[in-house]
Curated annotation (Swiss-Prot):
One of its GO terms (cellular component) is nucleus. GO terms for molecular function: DNA binding. This is Major basic nuclear protein 1. Residues 1-20 are annotated as: Disordered. It is found in: Nucleus. Keywords: DNA-binding, Nucleus. Transmembrane segments: none annotated. It comes from the Eukaryota.
């Protein structure tokens, strides 16, 4: 592996965990606590799911949906600031870092296929 690649991989690190990852029961409770959520209405649960999952990923940096998928966030290092020519004009580019969100299949899902 090239030295630049190794340095880039070392620079990528998981964000600091602010809390404990939500369990299956915690996820069900988050759905139940949503305003105007009724057990009989399946449509509302599907609308509440993305909001609950997004909030959990923002809070802890990862979320596991048992038997399906694990979502993780990674911090990518900042790109270098500088000047670049675009269409004959000099453009100033700011240094920017990113939080990358990736989803991985869980082992139980891999073995089923």
């Amino acid at each position: 592996m090239a030295p630049k690649m190794k340095a880039a991989m070392k620079a990528m690190k998981a964000p600091a965990m602010k809390g404990k990852a939500m369990t299956k029961t915690g996820l069900a409770e988050a759905w139940r606590r949503r305003p105007s959520f009724l057990r009989r209405t399946a449509g509302q649960s599907w609308r509440a799911w993305p909001r609950s999952c997004a909030a959990e990923v923002k809070k802890t940096g990862k979320l596991t949906i048992p038997g399906l998928v694990m979502v993780k966030t990674r911090k990518k290092p900042a790109t270098k600031a500088g000047k670049r020519e675009m269409f004959g004009k000099v453009v100033l580019v700011k240094a920017s870092c990113q939080d990358v969100v990736k989803a991985y299949p869980v082992k139980a899902l891999k073995t089923d296929f």
